[in-house]
A protein has these predicted regions:
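Structural marker of alpha-solenoid helical repeat scaffolds
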Residues: 42, 76, 110, 144, ...
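Canonical positions in the second alpha-helix
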Residues: 38-39, 72-73, 106-107, 140-141, ...
């Protein structure tokens, strides 16, 4: 990656130079840095020694020292192509692309037909936000090397960041076709489709990666979001088998719940709750799964745990009230309904459930009052319950009038 010049003839100390170059070739970078440091000390104006010292520091990832040496080289020998190029690459590596731009532009100006400086200049422009110019330079790089996967992917990024996703697609594809190592760029493209709410396009790409658990998880999640829970099950099962993370387990459980496959969903939810006992949403989800499979006692336990975690949740108190009612624990159910009402639940449903629960307890007067309040508030919203409420209200009124 790094440019190297045949600068041996510029060195003042043959011994330091010879041994330093041998150390560089043998990847003994500490030794090379020491030797070239001595050469620089012997002749501070020897730009070739400074260059090789910079290169040694680069290999040691002593980037600040390396950059200082490249700057010294350019001070002693302005416009040295190899130093311009290496300094620019180094600044890109250190995530200072704006500072890299002038070095790389000068390298391109010196050798406009060279592919590498043009590619790195394009990357520096892209990373520093000059998207239109980055696009221009990536296209110029591809004119010099049409088989560069790196240039294709860079051009794809430049286009995508300009909100030209449709234009970017063929370049993501080209990069993947030119070099299998760039195939993960397609996953990036799928993520961009997701952000753009193009779920069908994202799913199609993720499905090209059947062995990638994360990709299959995304397929399942997108299908769930698109209300295609049945189609989501297979990819989520595959993702769970390859990578049994908490997220994959929950997504698969969700798909099973939507498809009413409670026997498969409930064990997964039990594991999820055990792994995160302080997660309110998981207790609510597990409770509803148990409720829908008519397992009212364990459902009530989950909703009770939810009320402990979030005591101000009207939703949790209402769910708990419903399960206690089904378990014929009517006084406890009333207590939960009262708590939901205290928290602001003034809906017709709350009055209706109060009414039927008091009715079960044969508390006729409060039952009648709640039926009447429900009817006053419902106003046709719940026709079936309104019919039942009217019938019960008539009967209760008669019974009370006989007393």
């Amino acid at each position: 990656m790094w440019a190297s010049a045949a600068l041996l003839f510029f060195l003042q100390s043959a011994d330091y130079t010879t041994e330093g170059l041998k150390a560089l070739d043998a990847a003994k970078y500490d030794q090379a840095a020491d030797l070239f440091g001595k050469a620089v000390a012997a002749d501070p104006k020897d730009y070739a020694a400074h260059f090789h010292l910079a290169l040694s520091y680069t290999m040691l990832k002593r980037d600040a020292d390396s950059l200082a040496e490249y700057k010294k080289v350019l001070e002693l020998k302005p416009g040295l192509y190899e130093a311009e190029l290496n300094a620019g690459i180094l600044l890109i590596r250190d995530k200072e692309p704006a500072d890299a731009v002038p070095y790389l532009q000068q390298a391109v100006d010196q050798k406009p037909k060279e592919f590498r400086p043009k590619l790195y200049w394009a990357q520096a422009l892209l990373d520093s936000g000059d998207l239109a110019k980055a696009e221009q330079q990536y296209r110029a790089a591809l004119d010099l090397d049409a088989k560069s996967a790196a240039a294709e992917l860079g051009l794809a990024h430049a286009l995508a960041k300009q909100d030209r996703l449709a234009d970017a697609v063929p370049h993501f594809r080209a990069a993947a076709q030119l070099d299998p190592n760039y195939r993960d760029g397609l996953l990036e493209l799928a993520g961009l489709f997701e952000k753009n709410h193009q779920n069908a396009e994202a799913i199609a790409i993720y499905q090209e990666f059947p062995e990638n658990a994360a990709a299959q998880e995304h397929v399942g999640q997108l299908l769930l979001e698109s209300k295609h829970s049945a189609d989501a099950i297979a990819p989520l099962e595959a993702a769970m088998q390859k990578d049994p993370t908490a997220a994959n387990r929950l997504a698969l459980a969700t798909a099973y719940l939507f498809e009413k496959q409670f026997a498969k969903a409930l064990p997964l939810l039990d594991q999820s709750v055990a792994a995160e006992p302080g997660n309110y949403s998981l207790h609510m989800m597990y409770g509803r799964g148990l409720r829908d499979s008519k397992k009212y006692d364990p459902a009530a336990q989950q909703f009770f745990q939810a009320t402990k975690l979030k005591p101000d949740s009207r939703e949790a108190w209402n769910e708990l009230a419903g399960m206690l009612y089904m378990l014929e624990k009517f006084p406890e159910s009333l207590g939960a309904l009262d708590r939901a009402h205290q928290l602001g639940d003034d809906t017709p449903a709350n009055y209706y459930f109060h009414a039927i629960t008091y009715d079960k307890l044969r508390a006729l007067k409060p039952a009648l009052d709640y039926y009447r309040e429900f009817l006053a508030r419902s106003k046709g919203e719940f026709p079936d319950e309104e019919w039942k409420a009217r019938q019960r209200a008539k009967l209760l009124d008669r019974e009370l009038s006989k007393r």
